[in-house]
Amino acid sequence: MNDQPFLQFDDLQEYVATRLGSEGWITVYEYTESDRQKIGYYCALVAPDAVSRCLENTSWDLLIGHGMPGFSFYPDGTHRYYRFGDDDGVEPFIIDRDFHGLKPSYKELSEEFRHFHNLYEDRRAGVFIALDDNGDDVEVVRTTPKRVQVRAKYLKDYLAARGMHMLLFFEFDRWSEKSLGELGMEKQDEKRQESDYRYSRWVAPWEGVTNPSRKTFARIIGKKVIKGTENYRPSMGWGRENQQYEDFIIGVDDDGNEVHYTSDEEQLANYFGKNPGSPHYLTPVFFRKSVMAKYYNDPAKYRVEDGHVYCGGYWSLRLDNSHRDYVIVYLGDLGKLSHKEQLYWKSFNVLPDGGVSDVAFRRGILGEWADTDEPALSFKANYERFRDGWRKKHGWDLFKPLKPEDEHYWGTLHVPASENQKEFDDQVMALAKLLVERLNEREVAKYITVGPNEKGIAKFEKYLEAIGFPDRQRFITLLRNLNGLRSGPAHVKGRDYQRAAQHFDLEGKGLSHAISGLLVEATAMLVLLGSFSHQREPAKDDE
C-alpha cells in the first residue's frame, strides 16, 4: 500500500477545495478516531466583514467548550457582559455542555436555529425535525455523541436570514508505522489559502512518545467559509409566491377525451363574476375511495371526520366522503393543498360519475342540516350521541372510553375500499373493541344476577332482558357474531368465525359490503336502544 497520498491528504485537499460545505448534509461537529486517523470538525458563525480577519491564520476561532456567556474585566476595574464570552464577534452554533464529570455532558444545538426552523427534537432517534408545507417530517439535524450533521438547505437559509457566514473548522491527523525514509518521503510543511478557505498541512517524523509504533505523523488543519443561500427571500407562510397547482380531471369533451383544468383559484370562476367562461371553483373532482387509506392508516397524524380530513392543526381539506362510490373534492379546494399532497390526490383522480352525494348537496348547496348516511361516519356519529345520551340519562357509561393504547381503532374505523382481508379484520377488531370489549360489565352487573363464568355479552343480554328492551335478541345476535368474526384476526379462524361469516354472508356480499352492513346494523341498534333507554329506568337488583 502506498501511504504517500494518504499522509499528504491528497483526498482531503481536493475535498476542502471543492465539496466541503456544498453537500446535502454538512458535518458541523465530529470527533472520531480509527486505527490510522483522527477526525475533528467544529464550527462558528461570524459576520461577513470578519471573514478576512479569520482567514489570516488556520487556528480555530472558537474552541470546543468556548462561546458561553461571560464577563470581560478591564484595568480600570470595570467589567462588561458578553453573550458569547468576548467581543470578537464569533458565535457558537454547537455548544459543548460539560459538567465536570458530575453530570452527563452533551452537545447543544443553537437555540436560535432551532426556533428559526421550529425544530422538534426526537431524542430517542437523535434527530431534529421540521415540518414541511405538507405537515410531513423533514430531518434537519442528525446527532450522535461524536457527530452532528445539518441539512444544508436549512443551514444556509438560516445563515442568509441572519446575514452571517459559518466557519467550518477541520483538523485531521494521520500516522504511519513506517519512517519517512521507509516511505520515501521528506518533511512537508504547506500553507494554502483561497477566498473561502485556508489550511496548513505538514508531514513530520513522530517521536513515538504516546505510541512507539507510530513513526510518521501528518496533520491538516484549517477552516472553510460557508455562505448563506443566495437571493434568499423569507416566506410569509401563507402567500402564493411558491405555490404550484396541479390540473385535475373535471369531465370529457365531445369525443370522450378527458378534460383537465388547474386547481388555482385565481383562474377559476366564482359566483361573483370572476373568470367568466372558466370552470367554477366548486367543480366536483372525483377520486377513488382508496385515496383515504393514507389518512386512515396514520391516525396519529391524520383525522378523518364527516366532510373533512385534518392533518393535525396543520391543514384540512373539505370533501364529500358520504358518496357511496367515490370521494369528491371541489376543484378550488384542491389548490389549497401543498403541491406534494395535490400530487397524491391526483394519482387517484378518475372521471366524474354523476354528482356529489345527496348529503353534500343538501349541506353545501341548499344550506340544510343533513346527517351523513355513509355507514362508518354514521356509526361514529351515533355511537358518540348514544354514549352522551346514556351518560346524561343514567349517570354511567354503557360503553367505556377506549384505553389510550386502543384509541387508534376509532380513527381507523372505515368501510374498506377493497376486498382486503387484513383491512377487513382490522375493522372487525375496531368494532369489537367499541361494542364488546368496552361494555361496562361492572355497571351492568348491578342490575342483574350474574351466573358463574358469565362474561360481557351474556351479562348484557340479561341486562337488556331486565330493562325489557324488545330488540334485545337482534342486538345480542349482532354482538355474538361480531365477536365470532373477531376470533378470526385475534386467533385462528375456527368454528365461531365460520358461523359468523355465514351469518353476515361474507362470501355472497364480499368483505367491504359486509362491513358496511355490519355498521348499518350496529347503528340501528344504538339508535333503538338509545331511544328506548330514555323511556325507562331499571331498578337495581336487590338480591
Stretches found by the model and what they are:
Residues 473-502:
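Histidine-centered, metal-coordinating catalytic motifs and their short helical/loop contexts
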Residues 2-318, 332-481, 514-521, 525-543:
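Amphipathic alpha-helical interface elements
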Residues 501-509:
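Acidic, Ser/Thr/Gly/Pro-rich intrinsically disordered interaction regions
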